[in-house]
Design a protein with these regions (language model features):
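Small/polar loops that bind or transfer phosphate-bearing groups
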Residues: 20, 28, 126
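Short, hinge-like loop/turn segments at secondary-structure boundaries
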Residues: 8-14, 33-37, 64-67
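Rossmann-like NAD(P)H-binding beta-loop-alpha module
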Residues: 28-40, 59
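Rossmann-fold dehydrogenase core element
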Residues: 6-23, 41-46
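Short, small-residue-biased leader/transition segments that mark boundaries at the very start
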Residues: 1-3
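C-terminal substrate-binding/catalytic lobe of Rossmann-fold NAD(P)-dependent oxidoreductases
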Residues: 42-166
Length: 166
């Protein structure tokens, strides 16, 4: 049984809170990106640029993939994720989301989503300035699921119920 299956099984018995990122801000960015994807549809090229400290070993980050998955869920045609465009010499296909990872210095985490359209570009971004915000998000999540019925909960549940700061 994989971890995800174990989580779903346990959620039948107890409340479980899961998020790839415990920052309220990054999860709000995720919701904004879903709205942008719904409104703009397949008419804009989409790119995600993420920056983290030099010690981070995974690329792209789980948060970048979470953002890409959220955007993808709102598009009619499911895009593929392009991580390494420099090897392919061709025009950009329309059915992709480019994901670019930068590693350096001590950056906690920065994510920018670019919707590039005809004669305009829309950019949505989030910059984590301290890891304290992830701890605060975890504490808020613990408070949120306190006394909840068994089930799988996430940041979108907190955002939807406006309980994020309680």
């Amino acid at each position: 049984m994989c971890i995800r299956d174990s989580i779903y099984k346990a959620a039948k018995e107890i409340p479980i809170f899961f998020s790839a990122n415990m920052s309220l801000g990054i999860n709000l960015l995720c919701e904004l990106a879903k709205t942008a994807a719904r409104v703009l549809g397949g008419t804009y090229d989409i790119e995600i640029v993420e920056t983290h400290h030099a010690q981070k070993t995974d690329a792209p980050s789980g948060t970048a993939l979470m953002l890409a998955d959220a955007i993808s869920s709102e598009l009619e045609r499911k895009p593929y994720y392009e991580y390494d465009r420099h090897l392919r010499r061709a025009k950009r296909p329309h059915d992709e989301i480019g994901i670019h990872s930068i590693r350096g210095g001590t950056a906690v985490g920065e994510h920018e989503i670019i919707f590039a359209g005809y004669n305009e570009t829309i950019k949505l971004s989030h910059c984590a300035q301290s890891k304290e915000l992830f701890a605060a998000g975890a504490v808020n999540a613990a408070k949120f699921i306190q006394n909840k019925e068994p089930g799988l909960y996430g940041m979108s549940d907190m955002i939807d119920r406006k309980d994020a700061k309680k």
